[in-house]
């Protein structure tokens, strides 16, 4: 079983917001975020996955999720790379 760290993007009014998480079922988790059953922060928004990375263990994924959540520069670079291609 693999674990994934992912970055989601949503446009709210005139700006973009992001959400970082980890899971062992990426498709199901994104569907949950886009439904009313996702995390409290993600409810009611349309989320697009813009980054995901696979890890062999849950602890690796959790460590990388923590790093990505706290590395605003890296998140911004990922967002800019995605938005450049729109």
Descriptions of predicted regions:
Residues 55:
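Short, surface-exposed polybasic/aromatic micro-patch for ligand or macromolecular engagement
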Residues 58:
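C2H2-type zinc-finger recognition helix
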Residues 1-52, 62-69, 73-76, 80-86:
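GIY-YIG nuclease catalytic motif and its immediate N-terminal context
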